Curated annotation (Swiss-Prot):
A GO MF term: ATP binding
Domain of life: Bacteria
Keywords from the named record: ATP-binding, NAD, Nucleotide-binding, Nucleotidyltransferase, Pyridine nucleotide biosynthesis, Transferase
Catalytic activity, reaction form: nicotinate beta-D-ribonucleotide + ATP + H(+) = deamido-NAD(+) + diphosphate
Family: Belongs to the NadD family.
The protein's Enzyme Commission number: 2.7.7.18
Chain's role: Catalyzes the reversible adenylation of nicotinate mononucleotide (NaMN) to nicotinic acid adenine dinucleotide (NaAD).
Gene it is expressed from: nadD
GO biological process entries: NAD biosynthetic process
Protein name: Probable nicotinate-nucleotide adenylyltransferase
Pathway in which this enzyme or protein is active: Cofactor biosynthesis; NAD(+) biosynthesis; deamido-NAD(+) from nicotinate D-ribonucleotide: step 1/1
Length: 213
């Protein structure tokens, strides 16, 4: 049986414990040995990042330097066009054997807007979705047809993610940290401490670069 590969995308502006710790817990829960972080260059669904792509890449490298679970993939940073998950997953699938299990990790907030993503209906053709639950968000989709789509693909057994190459949605009971990049940027702008929110080497780099001031 080929091992499950997991991808974790985002802007990471900056990377923080709210990104890393839930995924580390997830890896222990469902048996992941490697998670590939894919930072995007031009996010299509949100405002453009304050730190440039080189700075965000370097912050990620600092954050995962002592974490063998994580590796970094730069393909989306090299695109000047918007970074679409559907496109990236198609590329990954073409690079792998067809029967290699592949999963894409998202937060529960992203699941609720998932039907607005570019070519969202193709994503489950190439990967599973692993959803990290977050308090305060509803468990149901806004429209009945999307709720039916969720139920058609939902599994409560993480072993299914290892046995099939794609097509399942798994809601993972991961811890939630009340941390966001927005909170960190606001605290830095106000001169407040962020030592408990992100790895020390990342904070040192932010201060050296004068970011988020």
């Amino acid at each position: 049986m080929k091992s499950l590969q997991a991808l974790f995308g985002g802007t990471f502006d900056p990377v923080h414990y709210g990104h890393l710790k839930p995924v580390e817990t997830l890896a222990n829960l469902i048996g992941l040995t490697r998670v590939t972080i894919i930072p995007n260059n031009v996010p299509p669904h949100r405002p453009q990042p304050e730190a440039n792509s080189v700075q965000r890449k370097h912050m990620l490298e600092l954050a995962i330097a002592d974490k063998p679970l994580f590796t970094l993939d730069e393909r989306e940073l090299k695109r000047n066009a918007p970074s679409y998950t559907a496109q990236t997953l198609k590329e990954w699938r073409q690079e792998q054997w067809p029967d290699v299990p592949l999963a894409f990790i998202i937060g529960q907030d992203s699941l609720l807007t998932f039907p607005t993503w570019y070519e969202y209906e193709t994503i489950l053709d190439n990967a599973h979705l692993i959803v990290c639950r977050r308090p305060g968000y509803p468990l149901e989709m806004a429209q009945p047809q999307y709720q039916q789509w969720l139920e058609d693909h939902l599994t409560h057994n993480p072993e299914d993610l290892h046995l099939q190459p794609a097509g399942k949605i798994y809601l993972a009971e991961t811890p939630w940290f009340n941390i966001s990049a927005t909170i960190i940027r606001e605290r830095l702008q106000n001169g407040e401490s962020c030592e408990d929110l992100l790895p020390e080497p990342v904070l040192t780099y932010i201060n050296q670069q004068g970011l988020y001031r």
